[in-house]
C-alpha cells in the first residue's frame, strides 16, 4: 500500500441505473470487488490498524490504577460483582451480563467478594482486583476504536479519513473516561459497536450469501450481548429492523430481483435479528438465576414463591390453611413488591398524627395483626369461625394493640389525590376502637385458588380486598415511598378508585390457638424459570419507573447535544475525575446533524422545483450512509425524552457514537471534494481537525487520569461556565506545586 493507495483509492463504486419497461430502476446487487475495497486486505493497512491499536492502548491504559479508590458507578457495579462471587441474589435496573463479566474477571484474579464498596472514595484493599476489572473494560474500549474504523471502512469512508476519525474517537474524553473504570456503559458501547459493524458489513455481499449470513449472525450475537447489558440495546435492534425495511424497499424497486427473494431476505433478517438476541437474553438470565441461589436483601422485594427457591430463605415452610376469627396473621400486598402490612411506633408528622401504617418488605413482629369481629372486639375467642365474604372485621396489631384505621384525612404523601384517604393505626390495649376501624372482607374469586379458597379466607390461596365500612374506600398501596420520617417504606392509603391488584391482599403467616383437629397446612408453590424471569422483569420495571429520579449530576436529554455540564466521578486532594466529552468533536457532531437536516430540507425543496440532485456517486453514498447512521442516532436519543428514570450525560454516548459515524462521512466528503480541486488539501483540513481534538484532549487529560494541574490551567480549561469541575482548591501554577513538594 503506497501513499497513492492510502489517499486516492475510491471505495465508492458507480451507481448502476437501468431502464425498465415502465421506469428506470436502481441495481441493488453489490459490485464484485466491493468487499475488497471496503475491508482491511493489504499488509500496509493492517500495519496502520496495528499502530491505531497501540496508540489507543496508550491513551486508554495510562495510569489505569489511578485513582486507587472507588469512583462514581464503581460502587454500584462492584457491589453486584461481590454478590455474584458469593452467589447472593440481587436485581439491578440493567440486565446482568456486564456484572457477570466483571465477576468472572475478578474471580480469575482470586477475589472472594468480601470488599465493602461503600461510598465513592472508599480506598481499594489489596485483595480487590480493581485494576484487572478496569483493564478488561479498557480493552473493550480499545477494540471499540478498531470497530469504529472498520465500520467507517465498510460504509465507504477512505482509509486515511477513517483512520483520522478513529484517532478522534480514541481521544474522545468521554469514551476514554468511561472505558477506564468498572462501569456498565463501556462494555455496552462495545457490544453495540460490534453489532453495527457486522450488520453494515453484511451489505458488502450478495443477500442471503454465506458471507452475508455470517456477518448477520455475528451482528445478531452482538445485539444479544448488547440487550443483555442494557435495555438500550433494544434501540439498536429497532434501528437494525428499520434498516432492513429500508434495504428491502430498494430491493423491491430493483426490477432485476424477484420479489420472492426480497421477501425471503427480509424474513431471514428479522428471524436472526429477533430470535438470536432473544435466545441470548434468556440464556444470560438463566445463568443469572441459577448462579444467584442465596437469599439476599434484594430478594425481600420478590414474591415468597420466588424466595422459597433461594438458600437460607426465611419464607415459612408451611402455615395453617384455614384462617379464623382470633388468628394472628401477616397480610401481603399482591400488586407491588412492597411487602407486608406494617405499623411501627412512629406517627405521621401531619394529618391525624396517628401511628404510621406502611408496607415493609421484611419479616417483622410489627407485621402481625389479630383478626377480630367488628361487633366483638377484644373478645376471648373459644370456637373456630371461618372468615367468609362480607364478614366485617377489625385488625388489631399484635405488638402495639392499635387497630387499622381510616378517616377523612389526606394521605401523607399522595396529598393531592382526592380519591385516597389516610390509613393509620389508632388505639391501645383494652380500647374497643370505633367504626373507623371496621373493614369488610371481599374475596376476589378470580385471583383465588379454585375451591374452598373462593368461599372463605385461606392462607396464601385466597386473594381478598378490605373495604372500609364507613367510607367505602379500599385498603390500597402503590409504589410511592414515604420520606425520611417514614423510613422510605411504601405508602398505604384507602382508595376509592384503583387497580384491583393494588387493593388485593393475601394472608401469609397464620397462627391460631383454637384450630381444627389435624389442621390442613399450605405452602407456597415453587416458581418455574419462566415465572422467575417474569418476576425479575416486573421488579426491574418497578425500579426503572419508581426509583428516585433526582441526583446532583442527573441531566435532561435536551441538554446532552450541547454538553452543558459533565459528571464528577471522583474528587480527592486536588485531583479529580470528571466525565466530559471532547467538546471539539461533540459540538461538531451536533452542528453537523443540524446542518444535514437543513441541507436535506433544501435539497427536497430544490427537487420539488425540478432541480436534479444526488447525481454524483459520492453525494449519493454520503446521503445513504448518513441517513442510516442518523436513524441510529435518533433511535438511541429520542426515546429518553419519554423515560421517567434518572438519566445522566453518559446515556447519550450510544447516540453520540452513531453521530460520530455520520460525521466521519462528512469529513470524508470534505476531503474528497477539496482534494479533487487542490491535491491533498482536504486531508490536511481533516488532519487539522484531528489536531484540534487532540488539543482539547490533552488540555483536559487531568480530568481523565486524575493527575494534578494548576488552578490557572483548570480555569482556562472551562470552555463553558456551567462545567463545574473544581479549580478553587488547586494551587495557582505548576511552580507552586514544585515549591510545595520541596517544602
Swiss-Prot record:
Query: What is its membrane topology?
Result: Multi-pass membrane protein
- Where would you find the membrane-spanning parts of this chain? 47-67, 130-150, 159-179, 181-201, 232-252, 265-285, 584-604, 624-644, 647-667, 684-704
EC?
2.4.1.109
Q: What is its main location?
A: endoplasmic reticulum
Q: Where are the glycosylation sites?
A: 33, 213, 380, 386
Signal peptide (residue range): none
**SMART domains xref list:** MIR
What catalytic activity does the UniProt entry give for this protein? a di-trans,poly-cis-dolichyl beta-D-mannosyl phosphate + L-seryl-[protein] = 3-O-(alpha-D-mannosyl)-L-seryl-[protein] + a di-trans,poly-cis-dolichyl phosphate + H(+); a di-trans,poly-cis-dolichyl beta-D-mannosyl phosphate + L-threonyl-[protein] = 3-O-(alpha-D-mannosyl)-L-threonyl-[protein] + a di-trans,poly-cis-dolichyl phosphate + H(+)
Instruction: Please state where this protein is localized.
Output: Endoplasmic reticulum membrane
Which stretches face the Lumenal side? 1-46, 151-158, 202-231, 286-583, 645-646, 705-743
Keywords linked to the UniProt accession = Endoplasmic reticulum, Glycoprotein, Glycosyltransferase, Membrane, Repeat, Transferase, Transmembrane, Transmembrane helix
Q: Which residues lie on this side of the membrane: Cytoplasmic?
A: 68-129, 180, 253-264, 605-623, 668-683
GO biological process, alphabetically ordered: fungal-type cell wall biogenesis; protein O-linked mannosylation; regulation of endoplasmic reticulum unfolded protein response
**Matching Gene3D superfamilies:** 2.80.10.50
SUPFAM superfamilies assigned to the protein according to its UniProt record, in alphabetical order: MIR domain
Under which name does UniProt file this protein? Answer: Dolichyl-phosphate-mannose--protein mannosyltransferase 5
> So what family is this one in?
Belongs to the glycosyltransferase 39 family.
Q: Which GO terms describe its molecular function?
A: dolichyl-phosphate-mannose-protein mannosyltransferase activity
Q: Which cysteines are joined by disulfide bonds?
A: none
Where do the MIR domain residues begin and end?
320-374, 384-444, 454-510
Pathway of action: Protein modification; protein glycosylation
Q: Name one GO cellular component term.
A: endoplasmic reticulum
Q: What is the lineage of its organism?
A: Eukaryota, Fungi, Dikarya, Ascomycota, Saccharomycotina
Quaternary structure per UniProt?
Answer: PMT3 and PMT5 form a functional heterodimer. Also forms a minor complex with PMT2.
